[in-house]
A protein has these predicted regions:
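An N-terminal hydrophobic leader/cap segment in hydrolases
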Residues: 15-59
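Acidic catalytic loop of the alpha/beta-hydrolase fold
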Residues: 232-236, 263
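C-terminal catalytic histidine-bearing segment of alpha/beta-hydrolase fold enzymes
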Residues: 242, 246-289, 300-302
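Short beta-strand/loop motif that positions the catalytic acidic residue
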Residues: 221-222, 226-229, 233
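Alpha/beta-hydrolase fold nucleophile elbow
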Residues: 151-161
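Hydrolase active-site cap/lid region
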Residues: 165-220, 264-267
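Short alpha-helix in the alpha/beta-hydrolase fold that links the catalytic acid
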Residues: 97-98, 214, 223, 237-246
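Membrane-embedded segments
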Residues: 61, 65-144
C-alpha cells in the first residue's frame, strides 16, 4: 500500500515539476523569446561604401548610442520621413541592403527612410530588458528625427513590423505622426505567450516580463491606420492582428493576405503598392489641410484689409464734410 502511494505521488509530482521547470525556463528566457539580437557585418560594410545611405548615431537621453541607417531624399532640403521599426530577428543593415538590392527602396522616393537597431542589434549596445526600454527606444528616435533640418517635422510617419508594431503604435499615440502602418501586428505580449504555452491565465500571467500592450496605446492614435495581416502567418496569429484593429478609432484599411508566411510580407508587391499609396495619401491630405488653412488665413487678411480701407475712406469723407 505504501509503495502504491509513493508511486501515486510520483505520478502527481512529476508532471507538476516538469511544468514548473518549463515555466522557470520560459520566464528566465523571455528576452530571447521576444528579441533575437543579431548583426550583419557584410551588409554593414556594403552600405558603408554606398553614398546613398548614411550611418546614423543617435545619443539618447540616458547617454547611450543607437545606431542605424538613413536613406535621405536628396531632392529636397526637407522631406517627409518614415521611421521603420523592425521585426525581432532583423537588423538595420540587412533590411536596408535588402531594400536596396531588390529595388524596393524606390517605394520611398521623395521620403527619408530611417531604420535604427534595437539594443543588442547591429552596433547598438545593451539589450531590451523591459517594456520601458523598448518604448523609449521609439520616442528617442522620433525626437531625434524631429530636430533634423532635412526632416519635415509636420510629416513624420511610422511603420512597424511584427515585434516592432508595439513601438510604432506607442510612438503614434504619444507623438504627432502623419501616418501609421502596421505589418503582422499583435494586440499584446500575453497573446504571444499563450500562443506558445497556453498557461498564462489568472495569477500566472503576472509572471510575464513583457506586456507590449499595443492595444492599450491604439485608442490614442489619431491618424488612420493601415494594417496588413495574413491568415497563413505562423508567428503572429491572424486573430491577434484582427483584435488589435478593433482598438483603433480610425482604420484606413485592414488588408487580409492569403497564403503569406511571416517572413514574406515584404516580398509582395501588393503590400508595397498599398504602403506607397497610403504614404502619399497621408502627405497629400496634410498638404490639403495646410492649403485650406492658408486659404482661410489669406481670406481673413483680405477681408480685414478691405475693412480697414473702407474705414479709412469713410474717415476721409467725414473729415471733408466737417471742413
Amino acid at each position: 500500500m505504501k509503495k502504491f502511494l509513493n508511486s501515486k505521488w510520483i505520478l502527481l509530482i512529476l508532471p507538476l515539476s516538469v511544468l514548473i521547470i518549463s515555466l522557470g525556463v520560459l520566464i528566465s528566457m523571455q528576452g530571447i523569446f521576444f528579441f533575437h539580437p543579431n548583426n550583419d557585418i557584410s551588409s554593414y560594410n556594403e552600405l558603408k561604401k554606398d553614398n546613398n545611405y548614411e550611418e546614423v548615431e543617435i545619443k539618447t537621453s540616458k547617454g547611450k548610442t543607437i545606431y542605424g541607417w538613413l536613406k535621405r531624399n536628396k531632392q529636397s532640403s526637407s522631406s517627409p520621413t518614415v521611421i521603420f521599426f523592425l521585426g525581432n530577428a532583423e537588423n538595420s543593415s540587412s533590411v536596408v541592403r535588402n531594400f536596396r538590392d531588390s529595388g524596393k527602396i524606390n517605394y520611398f522616393d521623395n521620403f527619408n527612410l530611417l531604420i535604427m537597431d534595437y539594443p543588442g542589434y547591429g552596433k547598438t549596445k545593451g539589450f531590451v530588458d523591459n517594456d520601458k526600454t523598448f518604448l523609449n527606444f521609439g520616442t528617442e528616435i522620433y525626437d531625434w528625427a524631429e530636430k533634423q533640418e532635412f526632416v519635415d517635422k509636420n510629416n513624420i510617419l511610422v511603420m512597424g513590423y511584427s515585434i516592432g508594431t508595439c513601438a510604432a503604435t506607442y510612438v503614434a499615440s504619444v507623438r504627432d505622426v502623419t501616418g501609421l502602418v502596421l505589418v503582422a501586428p499583435y494586440d499584446e505580449a500575453l497573446s504571444l505567450y499563450n500562443d506558445k504555452i497556453n498557461v498564462f491565465h489568472g495569477p500566472i500571467k503576472l509572471l510575464t516580463k513583457f506586456k507590449l500592450e499595443a492595444k492599450k496605446y491604439a485608442p490614442n492614435v489619431d491618424v488612420p491606420v493601415l494594417i496588413f495581416a495574413s491568415k497563413a502567418d505562423e508567428v503572429i496569429n491572424y486573430n491577434f492582428s484582427e483584435n488589435l484593429s478593433h482598438y483603433f478609432n480610425n482604420i484606413d484599411e485592414f488588408i487580409t493576405l492569403e497564403n503569406i508566411k511571416h517572413s514574406y510580407y515584404f516580398n509582395q508587391y501588393e503590400v508595397w503598392d498599398r504602403i506607397q499609396n497610403y504614404l502619399y495619401y497621408r502627405i497629400n491630405n496634410w498638404l490639403k489641410k495646410k492649403s485650406y488653412y492658408n486659404n482661410i488665413a489669406i481670406i481673413f487678411i483680405v477681408v480685414v484689409t478691405n475693412l480697414m480701407f473702407v474705414d479709412a475712406l469713410l474717415a476721409g469723407k467725414d473729415y471733408l464734410e466737417v471742413h
